[in-house]
Structures are given as C-alpha cells and as structure tokens.
From Swiss-Prot:
Keywords: Cleavage on pair of basic residues, Hormone, Secreted, Signal. Residues 26-31 form a propeptide. This is Parathyroid hormone. InterPro entries: PTH (IPR003625), PTH/PTH-rel (IPR001415). Residues 84-99 have a biased composition (Basic and acidic residues).
Length: 115
C-alpha cells in the first residue's frame, strides 16, 4: 500500500506533467486535422506551381516561335509543314495575314518577358 507521502509525490509529478504538457484543452486530433489540411494545401500549391512552370515554358516556346518570324498556322486545320529542308525558309508572300484576334494573341505573347 502507498503511504501518504508517496501519494503526494505522485500527485506532484502528475501535476507537473499536466502543467508542462500545455495542451490547453486542445485534443491531438485537432492538430492532426490541421496537419492534414496543411499537407493538402501544400500539395495543391506544388501542383499549381508545376502547372505555372509548364505554362511558362509553353508560352516561352510560343514567344520564341513568334519572335523567329514563323508563320501562324491556318485555323481551318490545313497543314503548313514543309516537305523538304529547303522549304523551311519563310517567304513573306506565302505568309498568312493575321486577323484581329490573332494580332491580340501575338501582342500578348511578344510582350511576355522571358525568365
């Protein structure tokens, strides 16, 4: 059987543990939920950053393509691929004139800053 002195020591140790733990009445599950939410937000942020990086690379490719003076493809789906290596030279008389919507797209792409 425990004496009163031993019981007081146990109570003091228990009080010290409870005081130093500082749970403030918050359950551990609440912290686990916030950690899960943090990881979810981090995952969304990382996937968003991947998409932004992919889009930046694609816009850079398009910007480089337009900056080199390459012709814009026809919208009716016809192919403008050169059949021979010599056909890769651009000739102004064969280039398609840009419509209003195409000009706006090209303006935006030209103004994009490469990084």
């Amino acid at each position: 059987m425990m004496s009163a002195k031993d019981m007081v020591k146990v109570m003091i140790v228990m009080l010290a543990i409870c005081f130093l733990a500082r749970s403030d009445g918050k359950s551990v599950k609440k912290r686990a939920v916030s950690e899960i939410q943090f990881m979810h937000n981090l995952g969304k942020h990382l996937s968003s950053m991947e998409r932004v990086e992919w889009l930046r690379k694609k816009l850079q490719d398009v910007h480089n393509f337009v900056a080199l003076g390459a012709s814009i493809a026809y919208r009716d789906g016809s192919s403008q691929r050169p059949r021979k290596k010599e056909d890769n030279v651009l000739v102004e008389s064969h280039q398609k004139s840009l419509g209003e919507a195409d000009k706006a797209d090209v303006d935006v792409l030209i103004k994009a800053k490469p990084q």
